[in-house]
Amino acid sequence: MFQTAWRQEPVTFEDVAVYFTQNEWASLDSVQRALYREVMLENYANVASLAFPFTTPVLVSQLEQGELPWGLDPWEPMGREALRGICPGDEARTEKEGLTPKDHVFKETESFRLMVGELPGNVSQHLDFGSSLEQPQGHWIIKTKSKRRHFTDTSARHHEAYAVKNGEKFEKLGKNISVSTQLTTNQTNPSGQISYECGQRGRYFIRMADFHRHQKCHTGEKSFECKECGKDFRYNSLLIRHQIIHTGKKPFKCKECGKGLSSDTALIQHQRIHTGEKPYECKECGKAFSSSSVFLQHQRFHTGEKLYECNECWKTFSCSSSFTVHQRMHTGEKPYECKECGKRLSSNTALTQHQRIHTGEKPFECKECGKAFNQKITLIQHQRVHTGEKPYERKVCGKTFSWCGRFILHQKLHTQKTPVQA
């Protein structure tokens, strides 16, 4: 029997990533976009768990922050080089097979769906089980028209794929597996292949786990919970990043000021403080923002949209993080603890601000007089001394104030009842 030598290659995120251009992304509906986000982030978490050192891909950062996951067109020279979405030799093969660039993209997308468990139109033409080859135990081959990859059981559990033979047997590298003993099925798709069908979208999946994962797109279920603070996440990759907060580790340092941050995404956003970059502009008022999440929150001020309502006091919030922190006022929960003095706080922001008392850090400096502060809100209030701005006005007497605290104190003087004379 023919022998073949196997070469081990580390799995990278690019091996399982699918990129869309702006036009292609616009053609997807909301459910397809949600499924794409879920699968990309889960695949990133799987690759990251292999412990190969690499920084977070731009695509993953975009998806985690709710940004639009398109940028450079992979069919332009600069985009192809930057995204590395095509393997060497694919361009020549595309021309040889008479495929247009977009045909190639959708062939890659279809092959990708197979790798994550979704059935494409015809499974058999996308897999090479190598029945004539003697293959090492525990290894899989996944072959598409554009690339062939070799994985081990340890490095590619999430790439498990099966092909259907005569509607009765599944084959995995030449080993027959009985449907009745290895896979419980509930539907037969239009091509006669046994699978799991989504009732809402009519999609078919090979594995039950992929079917249940897809259904979370419809229910919005969050299944990954932090054991430290109880916060839950839709994606495991977000949970992994969040857990760094509790460890206190800040491995990403800013070269400008030396500040340490817990993720490279946070570092990118922090660096915009130094560069002044604000890439997110509101079309309603023209205000620009350095963070996409803050930009999305700002837009809700124009629309009046408030997605989160407290069942205790019926107060509504446009931001989930503000809603979560607010709920802790009712429950008394304080999951964040200061390692210096043991004080517990209800939010990570409050913990960060509190820690500056111990470190003496004052990162917010007034450009007018050079005075520094440990909280941004204190800097904003101080700047009103220079600008003369007094945004808080008492309508009864017309008096104005630059600080909210002084305004509230003044209001109490008006509302205070005069003692009744005997």
UniProtKB/Swiss-Prot annotation:
**Gene3D superfamilies, A to Z:** 6.10.140.140, Classic Zinc Finger (3.30.160.60)
Q: Which gene encodes it?
A: ZNF620
A single GO molecular function, which one?
zinc ion binding
Q: Name one GO biological process term.
A: regulation of DNA-templated transcription
Give the record's keywords alphabetically: DNA-binding, Metal-binding, Nucleus, Repeat, Transcription, Transcription regulation, Zinc, Zinc-finger
Pfam families for the chain: KRAB (PF01352), zf-C2H2 (PF00096), zf-H2C2_2 (PF13465)
Gene Ontology cellular component?
A: nucleus
Signal sequence segment: none
Q: Which residues cross the membrane?
A: none
UniProt name for this protein: Zinc finger protein 620
What are the disulfide bonds?
none
Zn finger limits (C2H2-type): 196-218, 224-246, 252-274, 280-302, 308-330, 336-358, 364-386, 392-414
Functional note:
May be involved in transcriptional regulation.
Species of origin reads: Pongo abelii
Intracellular or extracellular location(s): Nucleus
Record domain KRAB: where: 11-82
Give the source lineage, highest ranks first. Eukaryota, Metazoa, Chordata, Craniata, Vertebrata
Does Zinc-finger show up as a keyword for this record?
yes
